[in-house]
């Protein structure tokens, strides 16, 4: 801290010089010395807060000062430093205190309360500890890698005390932390390990800070669903082909080694990220047969075969049970009314009563 250039009484200058000399020579006051007033223990504050340094005195003290290392901050009521953040808080018969506002890391270190009593200057020291919230200063960029490759992720953070860094995989299947280090190494990465990885830095000074890195794992297509389908002639038919791949697969359809093009009469090919749909609007005899779905990306290709076959409808057998009525005009049988069958037994029951 800068020193103020001002005139001070000679006695103060001599006292301050002796205090600085004692400080430089490392002359401490014993903790068990009950005859000498003591400064407080270590003071811990967070960056940006105010630190109060207190020194207990009594009526035997004739002069008192606060020093930071070899720089005099206050001597009595006189301010010796130019730092506007340092103010005198109390100068009484029992206490001599200063306060430092908006504390920063460079304020950390030893502070000394120096007193003059019985013509002998003595000192008592307090250490100011400045805590700093964690801050992530460097992380890996999002990465894209082929399945089976090795991945190294970095997360560098600062803070006081030094923050603890942890890595975890943001995935429903992930359990707990996968690393408690600045570096996360993944050997032979699989497609299940793709997704976001979160770096967290914490030191209990403030809430943890987090940053995420996206890891994309590329792999060749894998067809997960391709089923044969039966459709009657003249009906609408659909063949589906589902495939997983990163990057997304391109789909192609073939019938008997002949590629089917989009817009071909009576057909529609609809390709999405993870599936392809081949639609027949009016199935004919010529449409039946073997079809092949081919899924491909930069890493490879795969195919699956399926059959579009004719599905025949089974005619319902005409009803010829009790109450069936034959239509003489059409020759068809239909279910007739059964009311006349119930009339006779009901009439017989009525006569008995």
Curated annotation (Swiss-Prot):
The keyword Lipoprotein applies. It is found in: Cell membrane. One of its GO terms (cellular component) is plasma membrane. It holds the Pfam family ig. One of its GO terms (biological process) is cell adhesion. Residues 37-124, 134-216, 220-314 form the Ig-like C2-type domain. Residues 1-28 form the signal peptide. Belongs to the immunoglobulin superfamily. IgLON family. It may be a cellular address molecule specific to Purkinje cells. It may represent a receptor or a subunit of a receptor complex. This is Protein CEPU-1. It comes from Gallus gallus. The lineage of its organism: Eukaryota, Metazoa, Chordata, Craniata, Vertebrata.
